[in-house]
């Protein structure tokens, strides 16, 4: 085999260099996404703080390692449409992309029981390939990845490189935080942009200080793609914030529990990202509930850790977030639930059934 080694990029430093080869020729540079959030004056607040700590953090690629590998079955149905049984986290996205690929809207997608997902099945893997083979051969097709193929194909958790500075007063109250984060999104965008947005939006943690600034950039490289993974970027920045908070507690001379309790967000207060929290916020009560056992473990010399985190529920960041189902009485005289959400272990079928039974006179045994 004869091949030519093309210019390639494997680090963020290489991707950000002024003369760097571009992963995509049509792009001006290797930046996939950029996010900047600023409230108050973090620089001024940090400069006026009694205690200041700056630290560099790095987190690696992580594999989802779900038990069930990706699989799809496709065939022509009685309507002449290509019907795809899929195991992914977004049936509508699969429908959209397969329709674009095949150049027809005569495509249907139905999600089977997906099994584990954790974000690793957000992107298409075998669905479009099975559909294309059915389109060409007019035959039913099943494609299933082996474990090795699964590890090779689907995106991973983003590696993050973070520089963060925190300032506190003499009592351990956070005065300001400033951060720069860089993410390696690999050779394709996947969900690199939304992951970066979440990472920056929630990096400040569930605390009530008001001087915060973060600048985030996601870069294309020739590495394996990175995409959705539980926590969706917040895991990485939260790790940095919480570690820095532990270091600050040592510097101030108080426990990690105490520094979190003094800074904990309470109902009606405003987070560093500008969101006002509601009455469902229970961080203070949660910390109080573990204090006795935490203190006892410290006194006994046991290794004990403590961490706080927050993340969006649903879409968040101001985007409309609606959920719909279609309910149809079919020929079997049963009520069938049609939902675009995927069964990935969260008990979707059970919850939807419970909602119907609770709000109607329909019996459980009459629902499919």
Where are these predicted regions, by residue range?
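Structural alpha/beta core scaffold segments of enzyme domains
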Residues: 1-368
């Amino acid at each position: 085999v004869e091949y030519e080694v093309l210019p390639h990029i494997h680090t963020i430093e290489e991707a950000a260099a002024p003369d760097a080869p571009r992963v995509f020729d049509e792009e001006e540079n290797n930046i996939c996404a950029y996010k900047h959030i600023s409230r108050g004056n973090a620089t001024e607040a940090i400069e006026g703080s009694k205690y200041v700590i700056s630290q560099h953090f790095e987190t690696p690629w992580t594999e989802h390692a779900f038990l069930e590998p990706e699989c799809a079955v496709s065939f022509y149905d009685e309507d002449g449409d290509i019907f795809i049984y899929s195991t992914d986290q977004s049936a509508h996205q699969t429908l959209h992309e397969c329709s674009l690929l095949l150049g027809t809207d005569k495509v249907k997608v139905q999600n089977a029981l997906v099994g584990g997902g954790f974000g690793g099945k957000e992107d298409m893997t075998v669905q479009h390939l099975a559909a294309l083979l059915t389109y060409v051969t007019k035959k039913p097709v099943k494609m299933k990845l082996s474990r090795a193929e699964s590890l090779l194909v689907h995106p991973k958790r983003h590696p993050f490189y973070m520089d963060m500075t925190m300032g506190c007063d003499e009592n351990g109250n956070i005065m300001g935080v400033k951060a720069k984060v860089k993410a390696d999104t690999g050779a394709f965008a996947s969900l690199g942009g939304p992951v970066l947005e979440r990472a920056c939006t929630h990096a400040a943690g569930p605390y009530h200080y008001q001087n915060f600034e973060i600048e985030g950039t996601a870069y294309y490289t020739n590495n394996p793609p990175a995409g959705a993974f539980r926590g969706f970027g917040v895991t990485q920045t939260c790790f940095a914030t919480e570690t820095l908070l532990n270091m600050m507690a040592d510097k101030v001379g108080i426990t990690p529990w105490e520094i979190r309790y003094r800074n904990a967000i309470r109902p009606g207060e405003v987070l560093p990202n500008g969101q006002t929290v509601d009455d469902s916020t229970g961080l203070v009560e949660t910390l109080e509930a573990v204090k006795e056992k935490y203190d006892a473990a410290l006194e006994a010399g046991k290794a004990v850790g403590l961490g706080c985190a927050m993340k969006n529920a649903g879409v968040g960041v101001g985007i409309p977030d609606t959920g719909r189902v279609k309910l149809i009485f079919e020929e079997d005289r049963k009520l069938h639930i049609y939902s675009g959400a995927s069964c990935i272990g969260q008990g979707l079928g059970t919850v939807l059934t419970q909602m119907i039974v609770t709000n109607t006179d329909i019996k459980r045994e009459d629902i499919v």
